[in-house]
UniProtKB/Swiss-Prot annotation:
Zn(2)-C6 fungal-type transcription factor that has a role in the establishment of the fungus within the plant and/or the progress of the disease. Regulates the expression of virulence factors such as SIX1 and SIX6. One of its GO terms (cellular component) is nucleus. It comes from Fusarium oxysporum f. sp. lycopersici (strain 4287 / CBS 123668 / FGSC 9935 / NRRL 34936) (Fusarium vascular wilt of tomato). Residues 137-164 bind DNA. This is Zn(2)-C6 fungal-type transcription factor FTF1c. It is found in: Nucleus. PANTHER family: ZN(II)2CYS6 TRANSCRIPTION FACTOR (EUROFUNG) (PTHR47338:SF27), ZN(II)2CYS6 TRANSCRIPTION FACTOR (EUROFUNG)-RELATED (PTHR47338). Multiple copies of the gene are present in highly virulent fusarium oxysporum strains. Keywords: Metal-binding, Nucleus, Transcription, Transcription regulation, Virulence. The keyword Transmembrane helix does not apply. InterPro entries: TF_fung (IPR050815), Transcription_factor_dom_fun (IPR007219), Zn2-C6_fun-type_DNA-bd_sf (IPR036864), Zn2Cys6_DnaBD (IPR001138). Induction: Exclusively expressed during infection of common bean. Pfam families: Fungal_trans, Zn_clus.
């Protein structure tokens, strides 16, 4: 019988057939293997309800049953998804006919009930035996029942007479969650970023490192032929990195942050060449004030700007307007030109120009450059003179930060902020300008931080640059090596370069002035910032900080080169170099250091264990240094050199406080010397207060101290209990006095306030116009009427002398110099003082304790004793110097205590701290007679 003709057939049955026929049917089906005999289990359900025998099912009915089985979407026939091989299923096993293991009734044959499932022959991907069914049919999955897994129909489907469908899809199984894929990709992306960021030198090390396998592949998603080990970093990323490294650099776009910031900075720097032009004065005033700046300011406070370069650029019009405005603002106070003069005080003349320059500088704090830094330093000095303590303090701090941002504290050969990348070597003048700007910041920090509660910011060991060279070397551009602040020589000269072997000869006034101010900063830190209390050793011991500072001050003056030691010849040499004021200012600072250290030791007399010799030496050094400062100020006045540095005024103030004690001495030589020196200091302070506003306060402080001296002499109180309470007025304390400027009433001279009489008081008694000496000192700002006719008739010689002594107008002298008061005031003061206090006046002329006319003591030069009891120079050549007091100003009987002591002066000086036994000799035949 040819079975090839039966391509498709189905069987129908009524009930269970006999076992013999069923066995024969099974044998028959086993022998029948048609190539097209794929199981068509959809037709079985239709056969169960039809009454047709096997082999009689029409073809049309079969097709209808097949179409009906596809009505439900979940009951599609697997015939369309069957493999191409009709004899194998999707697991690679040969399909068996429906009668192979299960009878038509749905019950398996008893002899094959324990047969091994067909899917057990499959192996897992790892090559192990499969123990679980790989895929269940759709019906078993819906009913949550165990599927036997036979093909073409499982036991459950045969038993239930339902189609058995194994749903096989071509879509790969997705991971349980998307987070697994995300975690797998994240390390790869991080690895790519790291490889892009590493440098070329580190790629060789990374090439030998194998990239880790973060997560194994999901079963069924990776072909078996792909290796499980990943490639190395060099193999995976080597070609890409090589191409990236050799690729040409891309041009920067306009939106790049770095390039945009650079363009903004360049634009701001370009604006400096024209911003502020509208506020500039005329060209004539610019050149005039530039000369005034270099004559009165340059070198005395800071060594800023190179004069030849500045003047050349000024004439060519290539200077930034902000720099010109700054120079004009600070120099306007010293000019006498009618084009610059104003109705206000001299120290406020340049405020209009300073305000424009200040606005320009404060808007550019983000972009540091040397021009803005120089302007900040000069503006800080100007605000110092206008008593704007807050502004000066802030501008100084901003300048210091900007200097460190520009790396001026390092001695570099190239500009570190050069944006061109060319690294052009700096010239000697440019390097010296950078050094001097940094030293100016250092000095400003010392000046501004000298107060009690103002610590210093810049440490000495931070400045790693040489000290400035001599001024003539700087002006002519002659390079020369110098020492650093600690004495080291960074660039020692070689024998064959033609330079001076001794580097100290290359150091001028600027270098030793910096060292003097540095030592002064250490002393103020020791005295006013708590270091004195932390010293474990007493002041008089050699290991104490006090003795160390004293030795440093003395040795610094002794270590000056011969060309810088004070002498008349060296002063003339410095006049030829246009640096006499700088030379005098340096020596004033050196003497002030000795005065400051020695004065602090005088308060330790009553301490336990102090020796009289220690106190005697400290007192001698204090008075000698104070007298020496007055001598230098007098030499400057006679030589026509004006020492305009504000710190020089503070040195004169400190010296004046010592002289105020010497005035009441019972030693005639000390008394006369103190009178002459105090006159010099007070005149100098009155001249300085026209240019620097804070000296109004210092002059009033000297006046108060003198009044305390008079009160102490009258009362005769015991001062030994307050001998250790000596405190000092520091240079930086004016910040607290004038944090935001001073009012008009604080700097206006009393002579400018004219008293106005109302018309209703015309018939009343006239108000008195004169005051006594006691009233003058009691009232810091006395009022008086200024009558031009009376003044001209009473004191014509005073006005003539005033014109000879100063270049300022006579009216300004009368308004600002209380030393030159009228003779009418002096007569009234004489009458009041002699009547109230019993003062015995010698001579016919009236006496004013604030000034003495040249005719008052014609024989003063012949009766003048040496200035100091310790080898002081005679004042025979100062015969016409007006004295602060007459030869015998205190020939009166003051009450004293039983112990002969006097009550305290003020918080600055304690008179008892200077008292000593009258028999104590000073070493030159003179004795103390306080």
């Amino acid at each position: 019988m040819d079975f090839t003709n039966f391509d498709d057939f189905a069987f129908a049955y009524y009930g269970l057939p006999v076992r013999a026929s069923l066995v024969s049917l099974v044998d028959h089906t086993h022998t029948f293997q048609s190539p097209t005999a794929l199981p068509q289990h959809q037709a079985i359900s239709g056969l169960a309800h039809s009454g047709l025998p096997f082999g009689t099912l029409p073809t049309g009915n079969r097709n209808q049953s097949m179409e009906g089985s596809k009505a439900h979407p979940d009951r599609t026939s697997p015939a369309s998804e069957a493999p191409e091989d009709p004899t194998t299923d999707e697991f690679g096993l040969a399909s068996r006919s429906r009668a192979g293991g299960i009878d038509p009734g749905g019950k398996p044959k008893e002899d094959k009930a324990d047969a091994t499932p067909a899917w057990s022959e499959l192996k897992t991907k790892a090559g192990k035996e499969r123990k679980r069914l790989p895929l269940a049919c759709v019906a078993c999955r819906r009913k949550k029942s165990r599927c036997s897994g036979e093909k073409p129909a499982c036991e459950h489907c045969l038993r239930s007479y339902i189609p058995c469908v194994y749903k096989v899809t071509t879509r790969k199984a997705a991971p349980r969650t998307n987070c697994m894929a995300m975690l797998d990709k994240r390390p790869k992306r991080m690895e790519e970023r790291v490889i892009e960021a590493i440098s070329k030198s580190d790629q060789e090390v990374a090439s030998s490192v194998t990239r880790p396998v973060v997560k194994p592949a999901i079963p069924g998603t990776v072909p078996s032929s792909q290796p499980t080990k990943k490639r190395g970093a060099e193999e995976a990323f080597g070609p890409d990195l090589e191409a990236w490294a050799k690729a040409p650099s891309e041009p920067k776009t306009e939106g790049d942050d770095g390039s945009s910031s650079l363009q903004v900075q360049e634009g701001e720097e370009n604006k400096l060449q024209h911003e502020g032009t509208d506020a500039l004065p005329s060209k004539e005033i610019q050149e005039h004030l530039a000369e005034v700046f270099f004559d009165n300011i340059y070198g005395q406070s800071y060594h800023l700007l190179h004069k030849p370069s500045y003047m050349r650029k000024l004439k060519n019009g290539t200077l930034p307007p902000v720099l010109v405005l700054t120079v004009c603002a600070v120099a306007a106070r010293f000019t006498s030109s009618p084009l610059v003069s104003s109705s206000g005080p001299e120290f406020l003349r340049g405020e209009e120009w300073a305000s424009h320059a200040r606005d320009i500088c404060t808007r550019r704090y983000e972009w540091p450059n040397l021009t803005i830094l120089t302007c900040l330093l000069i503006l800080g000095l100007h605000e110092f003179g206008t008593c704007q303590g807050g502004r000066s303090w802030a501008l100084g701090g901003q300048a210091i930060r900007m200097a460190f941002a520009l790396q001026l504290h390092k001695d570099l050969e190239y500009d570190p902020l050069d944006r061109n990348g060319t690294k052009t070597q700096l010239s000697f003048i440019d390097r010296e300008i950078r050094r001097r700007i940094m030293w100016a910041c250092f000095l400003m920090d010392r000046f501004n931080s000298s107060g009690t509660d103002r610590p210093m910011f810049v440490r000495e060991d931070t400045i790693q640059i040489p000290l400035p060279v001599k001024e003539k070397y700087f002006q002519f551009g002659l390079p020369a090596p110098t020492e650093m602040l600690d004495g080291r020589v960074p660039h020692p000269p070689s024998p064959n370069d033609g330079q001076i072997a001794d580097v100290r000869e290359n150091m001028g006034v600027a270098a030793f002035l910096i060292r003097a101010i540095t030592l002064w900063g250490r002393i103020t830190t020791y005295l006013s910032q708590g270091c004195k209390d932390l010293d474990p050793n007493p002041l008089w011991e050699d290991e104490s900080h006090h003795m160390k500072h004293l030795n440093d001050a003395v040795n610094l003056e002794a270590s000056l080169p011969l060309s810088l030691k004070y002498s008349a010849e060296n002063l003339e040499v410095h006049k030829t170099e246009n640096t006499p004021s700088q030379f005098l200012f340096m020596h004033i600072c050196l003497q002030h250091n000795i005065l400051l250290v020695s004065r602090a030791a005088m308060s330790a007399r009553k301490q336990h264990g102090v020796h009289d010799d220690f106190f005697f030496e400290a007192s001698k050094r204090t008075f000698n240094a104070a007298n020496r400062i007055s001598e230098l100020l007098r030499e400057a006045e006679q030589s026509g050199c004006f020492v305009s540095a504000p710190f020089a005024g503070y040195c004169a103030f400190s010296s004046a406080t010592v002289h105020s004690v010497g005035i009441i001495s019972r030693n005639p030589s000390m008394k006369l010397a103190a009178q002459a020196n105090l006159t010099t200091n007070v005149k100098y302070l009155h001249k300085m207060k026209k240019y620097w506003g804070m000296f109004h306060w210092m002059v009033e402080n000297v006046r108060t101290q003198y009044q305390n001296v008079l009160d102490a002499m009258r009362a005769g109180a015991n001062v030994e209990e307050r001998a250790t309470q000596l405190s000092f007025l520091q240079y930086g304390d004016w910040f607290n006095r004038y944090p935001r400027g001073l009012s008009h009433a604080e700097f206006m001279d009393p002579a400018t306030h004219k008293r106005k009489d109302s018309g209703a008081d015309g018939v009343l008694e006239a108000n008195p116009e004169l005051r006594s000496v006691e009233e003058y000192f009691t009232l810091p700002t006395p009022q008086r009427v200024e009558n031009k006719d009376t003044i001209s008739a009473a004191a014509p010689k005073r006005k003539q002398n005033a014109k000879k002594q100063t270049d300022m107008p006579a009216q300004s002298d009368r308004n600002l110099d209380w030393l030159q008061s009228t003779d009418a005031d002096a007569v009234s003061q004489e009458r009041k003082l002699s009547g109230g206090l019993g003062l015995q006046i010698t001579g016919s002329a009236g006496f004013n304790p604030l000034t003495a006319s040249n005719q008052q003591s014609p024989d003063f030069s012949t009766t003048m004793l040496p200035m100091s009891p310790v080898n002081m120079t005679s004042f025979a050549h100062h015969a016409h110097t007006p004295t602060f007091f007459p030869p015998q100003p205190f020939a009166m009987n003051f009450g004293q205590g039983s112990n002969g002591n006097i009550d305290p002066l003020d918080r600055q000086f304690i008179y008892g701290g200077y008292s000593m036994d009258a028999s104590t000799s000073l070493g030159d035949g003179h004795t103390w007679a306080l």
